[in-house]
């Protein structure tokens, strides 16, 4: 088993978490206790997540839209416990371990529920699938691709036309894709992340 130290998760970045089908984990409702399901990626903050490091390989997964965390409903530990959004209460039901797989995907394991994996109800991977935890199975519904979200505002600023009288800069290079899969798997300090 590879350690989380092999997954690049930058402290100041946001990520999509995608199923094999390309559907991403999203906050359907951004209120306290709101649903978390799979959906088509539309560059919305409800679909983007920060991994907040809590310790050796342990993270809180924070939603970009509202700052709420992926949490276990009623702090459940049983197979089939649904995930929902909740404010940061410092509880271990909001802590997750990122475990790389040989295929380049990851399993997201509950630190609270004995390592059960984020999974979809009924093994669904299509849009609308509800998220839960379940003991490890060989199915694709527990395998996730974490991809960094490129800051669209910075990319747009590079391609804007200069104002009249301003010196025109070199043409912008082709825009990068909205999300690039995380391939290397190691922690990098925020300072090194800022250099790139």
Q: Which residues does each PLM region occupy?
A:
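Lectin-like carbohydrate-binding module/patch detector with strong preference for beta-trefoil
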Residues: 1-176, 180-196
């Amino acid at each position: 088993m590879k350690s989380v130290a092999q997954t690049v998760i930058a402290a100041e970045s946001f990520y999509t978490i995608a199923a094999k089908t390309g559907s991403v984990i999203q906050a359907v409702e951004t209120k306290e206790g709101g649903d978390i399901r799979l959906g088509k990626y539309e560059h919305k903050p409800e679909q983007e997540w920060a991994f907040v490091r809590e310790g050796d390989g342990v993270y809180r997964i924070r939603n970009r839209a509202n700052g709420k965390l992926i949490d276990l409903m009623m702090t459940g530990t049983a197979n089939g416990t649904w995930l929902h959004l909740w404010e940061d209460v410092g509880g271990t039901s909001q802590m997750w371990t990122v475990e790389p797989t040989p295929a380049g995907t990851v399993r997201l394991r509950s630190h609270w529920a004995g390592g059960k994996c984020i999974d979809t109800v009924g093994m669904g991977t299509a849009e609308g699938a509800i998220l839960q935890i379940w003991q490890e199975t060989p199915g694709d519904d527990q395998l996730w691709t974490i991809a960094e979200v490129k800051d669209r505002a910075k990319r747009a600023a590079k391609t804007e036309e200069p104002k009249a009288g301003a010196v025109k800069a070199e043409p912008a290079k082709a825009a990068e894709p909205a999300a690039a899969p995380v391939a290397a798997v190691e922690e990098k300090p925020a300072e090194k992340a800022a250099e790139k």
